[in-house]
């Protein structure tokens, strides 16, 4: 989290927000029933170590919910090098199996995988589709000129974004 974001949450929502590394937070010996990590696992250079540290922060029956994309999804395989989540600041890519193994090796049992559709403006969707499917650029250019379409929100479900639900296994 940014300092600005942490302060905003503290001041406006009266939340206990910690803006520090996991290593520093572990020293406080605080345990949690639930930890949520939304769209962050792919940014860690050593996600295996992060899961080990998260395990230490969970109570005995603690839960971990994390969201990330499944690199083995049909959509990711179909788009290949044009897959829109292959970007420089994503350091690691996961499959369902990889996360299951990482979890088990860190006393976290993968209990459930849920599809995680997102919503976006039609204008943004057209921009992205133009990058992924450049041969259809003529069609996307026509659609992008229809102003009222740009701000319509659409549900996008490519079956590649997932919510992973883990439960801590006794130490």
Give the role of each language-model region:
Residues 7, 56, 83, 154-155:
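Short secondary-structure boundary/capping segments
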Residues 17, 110-113:
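Generic structural signal for residues in well-ordered beta-strands
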Residues 41, 90, 115-116:
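Short N-terminal micro-motifs specific to bacterial/archaeal maturation
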Residues 83-97:
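Acceptor-substrate binding/catalytic loop of class I
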Residues 1-78, 93-106, 161-168:
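Conserved SAM-binding loop
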Residues 112-171:
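A C-terminal cap/extension of S-adenosyl-L-methionine-dependent methyltransferases
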